[in-house]
Amino acid sequence: FLWRMGRTRLYINGGGSLMQDVTSHRSLWFYLFTISAAKALGCQVMMYGCGIGPIHAPANRRRAAKVLQKSVDAITLRDTHSRAELEDMGVTHPEVILSADPTVILPAAPEPVIDGLLESQGIDPHGRYIGFALRPWPGFEQKAAVFGAAADYAYEKYGLTPVFLPIERRLDVGAAKLA
C-alpha cells in the first residue's frame, strides 16, 4: 500500500461517510492514516463527495480536525450536515465545496445491463420501483418502522414497489427486514 502510495501523485479519499466513529474508531483511524500517509509521501490529497460525521469521541474529533486541516488539499462534501460537522470541529482549511453526491451524477448503466441485473434478482425490469438502501445505526430499531411506512406509502399513493437494496449484505439485509 505505502509503496504504491509513494508512486501516486493524487490520492482521492471518496464517497460514503468514511469520516465517522459510529461504526468503529478503527475505521476512522484507518482513513485518517491513509490521508496522512498520502500527504507524507508527497501526494496531493482530495476528499471527494464525502460525508463527515458523526464523530463523537473528543479525541477522534481533535485527531480528525488536525489531519484534515494539515493534510487535505481539496474537499467536496455531499451535504450541509457534513459542512457543519467540519465547522464545528474547527476545520478552516482547505476551502470546502458543497457538491452533489457522486452517486446521483453518474450516468445510468445501459438499459440492457439494468434489465439483466433486475431479472437476475427476480424483479420485472418493466415495473415501477422505489429503492431503499438501509444501514443499521444505534437506535435504528426504533426508527425502522418509519421506513416501512414510507415504503407502504410509496406503494399505495404512487404504485411504486419497494425494493430494498443491500449495499453491504451482512449489515443491510437485517436493516431491511426490520423495516
Which residues does each predicted region cover?
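Active-site anion-handling motifs in enzyme catalytic cores
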Residues: 1-179
